[in-house]
Design a protein with these regions (language model features):
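Metalloprotease/metallohydrolase-associated module, dominated by Zn2+-dependent proteases
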Residues: 2-77, 97-152
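Active-site recognition of the HExxH zinc-binding catalytic motif
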Residues: 81-96
C-alpha cells in the first residue's frame, strides 16, 4: 500500500506543476508536449527484478518508477527523491529529442526550477550529499547548474 501512496503523492505534485506551467507558459513547445504527453493512468511501479530504475516509454505511453532505496528491499524512498526522479522522467516527455541531450538537460533544469517555485520539490545538492535510489546513487542535480550552458 505504501507504494500506491507514494505514486499518488508524486502524481499530485506533477499535476500541481502542470497546472502552473499551463498558466505561465501556455504557448511554449516543451510545455505543450508535456501537457499532452503526461498521463497519470500509465504511472507504474517498477518491479525489483527490472533492469531499469525509472523510464518513460514513447514520450508518455508508460511511466515507471522504482520506489525502493535498494532493489529487492522493502524500504521506500522519500517523496522528495521520488519527485526529483519523476521530474527527470517528465523532462523526457517535454523534449523532442531522445536521451540525455542538451535539450533534455535544459528542460530538466527548467522543470526543476518551476517545481521549486511551485513548492512541490525541495532542491538537494546531490554533489554534496548523494542519495541512494534503487541501488544507484544520485550525485548531481541540474538545479544547481544555474549559470551553466549545456553543450551537446
Amino acid at each position: 500500500m505504501k507504494g500506491v501512496k507514494l505514486l499518488d503523492a508524486a502524481n499530485k505534485k506533477v499535476v500541481t506543476l502542470l497546472k502552473q506551467l499551463k498558466n505561465k507558459y501556455p504557448s511554449e513547445p516543451n510545455v505543450k508536449r508535456l501537457l499532452k504527453g503526461y498521463n497519470a493512468m500509465v504511472l507504474h511501479e517498477i518491479l525489483p527484478f527490472s533492469d531499469h530504475v525509472a523510464y518513460v516509454k514513447d514520450k508518455g505511453d508508460k511511466l515507471a518508477l522504482c520506489l525502493q532505496l535498494e532493489k529487492y528491499e522493502s524500504k521506500f524512498i522519500d517523496i522528495n527523491t521520488l519527485t526529483f526522479v519523476i521530474l527527470h522522467e517528465i523532462s523526457h516527455i517535454s523534449s523532442k529529442s531522445i536521451g540525455h541531450t542538451t535539450e533534455f538537460r535544459e528542460n530538466f533544469r527548467f522543470i526543476l526550477d518551476e517545481a521549486v517555485k511551485a513548492t512541490i520539490y525541495e532542491p538537494k545538492d546531490y554533489s554534496k550529499n548523494p542519495v541512494r535510489y534503487c541501488g544507484m546513487v544520485i550525485k548531481h542535480n541540474p538545479y544547481f547548474d544555474i549559470n551553466k550552458k549545456f553543450d551537446s
